[in-house]
Amino acid sequence: MTNKNQFNGLLLVDKPSGISSHDVVARLRRILSTRAVGHSGTLDPMASGLMACLVNEGTKLSQYILEGDKGYRLRAQFGIRTDTLDTTGETLETRPTDHLTRELILSEALKLQGEMEVEVPIYSAIKVQGKKLYEYARGEQEVTIPKKVMKFWDIEPVEIGSDWAEFDIKCSKGSYIRTWIDLLGKALGCGAAMSGLRRTWSSPYKIDQAQTLEQIEASVKGGSLGPAFVPMELALPQVKRIRIKGQDKVLLGNGQISHDLRSQLISAFNPDVDQYIQVLAQEGGELLAVIGLEPGRGFVLRRVFKYS
């Protein structure tokens, strides 16, 4: 494949720590010679791990990829509180950790499972009255910090030291690991800050499917995107699919749902479990559209994909 602009789909990138998510996107734009690159979820500069990046027509999949749950390996430093809830921030307080034991740390960590409504970090991009929270923090302006329902589960200890611990954890989209660590520090009575974070899972993708930017660049120079590339038709394995051909396909390309396609949708769509259905070509298998069901409107085209 010689034209890099022909690539459509996802790139699973193993982001290094020390650079921003925007830096990753900018690097991919240079590698792929296209502006049409985005991502499906920000990772803080100090964090590493899986970023699902979207290329060309793949950028239209952003909202569907964003909805997935996430998995992380975190490292918590006990005995410290900072303004950013991680060790890059300004230290607000230090406390002794002599009372900590492995059993106590693990016991309190496992209590922090399930749904909870908690304040979001002040250093976050959540907007209040049209302004990002971190802008209030940097300007030392008062603001009421909103609360958000977050969900954490599958908490597994990796290693626990005298004043630190590593855990594997899963969470709902939009949940903050920094907040979970802060809650753990409060439960232990000594405070805690995030000192390391690696995203290992962004449903339905895992970190072992990803490649570094250097590996991706080498693959592209060799004429492909390598194993980290996920084509459009495989990008949403969790979404039910149906296939069409002939006039149904022609009409869909013009933004119309044919009678036969509507009949297929009625048979396939289960409103109790399905949010969307993806429509693929019978021949060739390319992803043609994503269709949803809206009350009072019936089946609606959410996305139609065009390939040059």
From Swiss-Prot:
Which reaction(s) does the protein catalyse, per the Swiss-Prot or TrEMBL entry?
uridine(55) in tRNA = pseudouridine(55) in tRNA
Q: What is its EC number?
A: 5.4.99.25
InterPro entries given in the database record: PsdUridine_synth_cat_dom_sf, PsdUridine_synth_N, tRNA_psdUridine_synth_TruB, TruB_C
Family designation: Belongs to the pseudouridine synthase TruB family. Type 1 subfamily.
Q: Which gene encodes it?
A: truB
Q: What does this protein do?
A: Responsible for synthesis of pseudouridine from uracil-55 in the psi GC loop of transfer RNAs.
Q: Alphabetically list the UniProt keywords.
A: Isomerase, tRNA processing
Q: Does the keyword Lipid metabolism apply?
A: no
**Under the GO molecular function aspect, what terms does this record hold?**
RNA binding; tRNA pseudouridine(55) synthase activity
Which HAMAP family does the entry mention?
TruB_bact
**Which EC main class describes this enzyme?**
isomerase
> Has keyword Isomerase?
yes
What is the designated name of this protein?
tRNA pseudouridine synthase B
This chain's source organism reads: Bdellovibrio bacteriovorus (strain ATCC 15356 / DSM 50701 / NCIMB 9529 / HD100)
Q: Which residues form the active site?
A: 44 (nucleophile)
Query: Which Gene3D superfamilies does the record associate with it?
Result: Pseudouridine synthase
Biological process, per Gene Ontology: mRNA pseudouridine synthesis; tRNA pseudouridine synthesis
